[in-house]
């Protein structure tokens, strides 16, 4: 069925041009299945909602800085059978994000901590949450740079806005001033306001030795 010459510009004017992608297909379905006008309109609007949802998800994932291949589906649980798969499936529901709770992933290098951290963040993005993935060292360098040009507060906001912040590779090396203070301020500001996923090759009991000045 040929589209009306007026229909295309009207849909674009209403920012509904995505409907054009499935309009002809839906027209054929409507004729074959004898849909009512209301059913036909509902299918078109469902298509538009789905398209917009996928577009928004793609934007959230891009802004989060996540590797699209790091998902729970691509993680090799057989490689490290000590990982509690059921617990990760539960975390993938993202209830911890809704409750502003935190997740710590510890283990030796090469055990998949970063992969799992990104996978959980992707699941959160799929549920409508904003995420940001960044190595701890890179974050601290960025905050430190803000002390030189008086942009520290603005830079800190970058890490307070996301619903879930993934801090990768904490503990690779000791922290020197002002890094401990910056990290403390960040965690303190996010406490009960947003979630953190922290990956580390050191157990929490070892963390105090990373700080030159205990907090």
Which positions does each model-derived feature cover?
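Interdomain "pre-motor" coupling segment immediately N-terminal to P-loop NTPase/helicase cores
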Residues: 17-68
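Conserved P-loop
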Residues: 83-161, 208-211
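Short hinge/gating elements
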Residues: 6-9, 25-29, 74, 102-106, ...
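Charged, compositionally biased N-terminal leader segments and the immediate start
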Residues: 1-20
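Dynamic helix-loop-helix/coil hinge segments at AAA+ ATPase domain boundaries and subdomain interfaces
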Residues: 10-13, 62-84
């Amino acid at each position: 069925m040929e589209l009306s010459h007026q229909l295309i510009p009207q849909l674009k004017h209403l920012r509904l041009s995505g409907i054009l992608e499935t309009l002809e297909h839906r027209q054929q379905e409507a004729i074959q299945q004898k849909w009512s006008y209301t059913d036909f309109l509902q299918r078109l609007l469902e298509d538009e909602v789905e398209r917009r949802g996928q577009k928004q998800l793609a934007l959230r994932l891009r802004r989060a800085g996540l590797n699209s291949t790091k998902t729970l589906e691509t993680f090799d649980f057989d490689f490290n059978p000590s990982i509690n798969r059921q617990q990760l499936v539960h975390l993938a529901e993202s209830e911890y994000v809704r409750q502003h709770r935190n997740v710590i992933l510890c283990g030796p290098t090469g055990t998949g901590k970063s992969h799992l951290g990104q996978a959980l963040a992707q699941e959160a993005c799929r549920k409508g949450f904003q995420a940001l993935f960044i190595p701890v060292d890179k974050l601290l360098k960025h905050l430190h740079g803000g002390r030189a040009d008086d942009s520290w507060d603005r830079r800190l906001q970058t890490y307070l806005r996301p619903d879930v912040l993934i801090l990768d590779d904490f503990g690779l090396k000791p922290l020197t001033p002002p890094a401990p203070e910056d990290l403390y301020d960040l965690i303190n500001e996010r406490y009960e306001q947003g979630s953190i996923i922290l990956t580390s090759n050191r157990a929490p009991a070892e963390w105090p030795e990373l700080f030159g000045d205990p907090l």
